Amino acid sequence: MKNIKSQILLASLLVASLSCIAAPRLVYFGDTLQWNTDWVKKQCGTLDIKANIIEVSGIACSRVTPGYIWMQSDETAKYIIATDEKGEKRACKVNMSKTIRWDWEDMSGGVYEGKNYLFIGAFGDNDETDGEYSVVWFEEPAIDPENAPEITVTPNRIKYVYPDGKKHNNEALMYDNRDQVIYIITKVYYNVCQVFSLPFRTDYGDEEQTLTYVCDLGVKSDLGEGTKPYKGFHLVTAADISPDGKYILIKNHNNIVATYCWVLLFTREEGESVAETLIRQTHPEPIKAYNTYEWQGEAICWLDSATFYTTSDADDGNPPIYKYTKKVNAAVETVQTKKADDKTLVMIDNVMYIRSKQGLFTLDGRKVQ
């Protein structure tokens, strides 16, 4: 009994010590980036993998049925599921009428010609030997847990190749609502990851498309010359663009310990393409997105431009679901649009809030200040 208690104590001390370790600094284009401290992280739920899905590698907030999060696994290309942010119960299972490649690695949602679509990156290729890459897409279905807990859709796909003619491993995909462009990011160990783009259309058919090279995420010298720890940004596992197109998140996991995750936040200027933002902003703001229990963090998505979620690729434990909320600074309130019943609608950083005597709330009633 003493031995068991000693082991438990040792494990607890180890966890505590890991959680107290300062995150290593991130070097990007030769400079050490400064942490962005404008985001508050909290665990909003725990994903019950037996009731939902294992090894989540991509998530996307539902736009058709707000309040739910779509999730897909890199273990199956047969279905996706939807759950709420608590992750306790599956609200919907969407089966694919046909299987399109097995290694799904990321997903995103977006609007095209007035319709909401879901995009899935069927492009994982760890050994860079496959060479068959595609983006799976279909119109986002409504979520109705009571009347339609399980439905079937017919997926489409866009087959593509890289402009260099080589094979690449990928784990990150994002869709830009402003310009209707899909962005794909390679996952590279101990080297610089690359960004590619493809305009979305629904009429590509079966013809292979060639991606356009956009940029590198950093330079090789950021990583050091064969030394550990590697301080540069590599091993990209997820990405997403806010619905209004203003913010870009790119997530990785570090090689020091897989629990360390960096999230780069890029801010897009008006009239700028995503490609122009990534090329211009060589000093993005890294958000502290590491946690002792966020093992293999491979999924990220925006709810709105002030809130995003992350979760992890786990098959032997229920991973936490984290919610990041941007801190609100009353000094940046720019518009007061309506006042009724002692409540005022205010616009802060392009996001609408309700201010009352009790504090500041999101439109769905969540208190943020």
Name every feature range the model reports, one short phrase each.
Residues 83, 241, 302, 346-347, ...:
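Hydrophobic alpha-helical segments, especially N-terminal targeting/anchoring helices
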Residues 15, 124, 333-337:
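Alpha-helical hydrophobic packing sites
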Residues 6-8, 255, 335, 357:
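Intrinsically disordered, low-complexity regions enriched in polar/acidic and amide residues
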Residues 1-32, 369:
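Bacterial Sec-dependent N-terminal signal peptides
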Residues 328-357, 367-368:
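Residue-level detector of functionally pivotal "anchor" positions at catalytic/ligand-binding pockets or at interdomain
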Residues 23-329:
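Sequence/structural signature of beta-propeller domains
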Residues 90, 368-369:
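Surface-exposed loop/edge segments in extracytoplasmic proteins
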